[in-house]
Amino acid sequence: MLRKRAHSSEWSRQSDVTALPILSPAMTSALVLLNPFAGGGRAAKLEDAIRTHVRSDHPGARFVVAGTVADAHAMIEDTPPDARIVLVGGDGTVNRMLPALVRTQRELGIVPLGSGNDVARALGVYGLAWVDALAHALSAPATAMDAGVVTFGEREVPFLACCTCGFDSAVALRALNGPKFLRGLPRYLLATLRELVALRHWQLTVHCEGKPLRAGTTLFASALNTPTFGSGIPAVPHANIRDGLLDVLIAGRFSRAGAMVMLPRLLLGKHLADPRLHSNAFRGIEIHATPNVPIAVDGEYLGESAHLLIDVLPATLRVVARTNDTPAIT
């Protein structure tokens, strides 16, 4: 059983009473929950438009803007068992709601208005106008999706897109604290360039399902469920969110010049032929690090640890996806 994250934090504002719907939870067929801080405040600018649209075009749905993560979890848990949860935000929004979604087994739809949106990319809904994404999230069928969980210290944190260790996590922290006027890939690339100035390495020992996988100087070791991370970077293009496996991408020692040469290859998904990179599918891995390695999940920085476990949670969540044969929304 997943434990509730100890650091549940505020969305940074109190609940807006005017955003609360007329419908009671018992009458709700879906809960549309908006994170006003997603996408650097982009979601907040659409709050009134989305609320009005939900009330006029989707009267069975309930629209809310939660003041805190705890409030949002409580709203999810108060919805009827067959109600769908539609999150308006990005990967961070989805990650913070994931414990409640897994615990209640509610179906998940996404309206991607965040900075990262790698989960939305994997589900095929990234790039849709929010009106179309909302209609799809409320009406299309759901399918099973894998998740992952990282355990370190006393914490057990689930994720849908990725768990990064090392350089990638340091970049995630810089991206979270980056300029507000940048979103998505440009923000991530700026954070990457800034972290290259430091270019730290760690001594990592990685075991995959009990067998040695790698030991030595390592730039990063990141586990992916989705093909992309960092706002669309195709780190493991062959990753599959429904295969019951995660994929680890491990980078050995890189100089600054070598990392700069590798970056455009990574952006194009042409990096896996490099002998300093190793990719391996797994159900569970164990990592020992010296010194403590920074950890992030779905772009959310968690802290540092000398020891962590990463495991797949097969078919743990039902999500609304869109494939090439999904009928167009009209």
Per-segment meaning from a language model:
Residues 2, 16-88, 95, 103, ...:
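ATP/NTP phosphate-donor binding region
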Residues 43, 208, 215, 240-241, ...:
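ATP/nucleoside-binding phosphotransfer catalytic cores, i.e., glycine-rich phosphate-binding loops
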Residues 44-46, 97-101, 121-123, 234-235:
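Short amphipathic alpha-helical segments
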Residues 57, 63-66, 102-107, 111-219, ...:
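Catalytic core of DAGKc-family lipid kinases
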Residues 164, 168, 222-236, 301:
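Glycine-rich phosphate/pyrophosphate-binding beta-alpha loops
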Residues 179-187, 229, 237-258:
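Gly/Ser/Thr-rich active-site loops/lids in small-molecule metabolic enzymes
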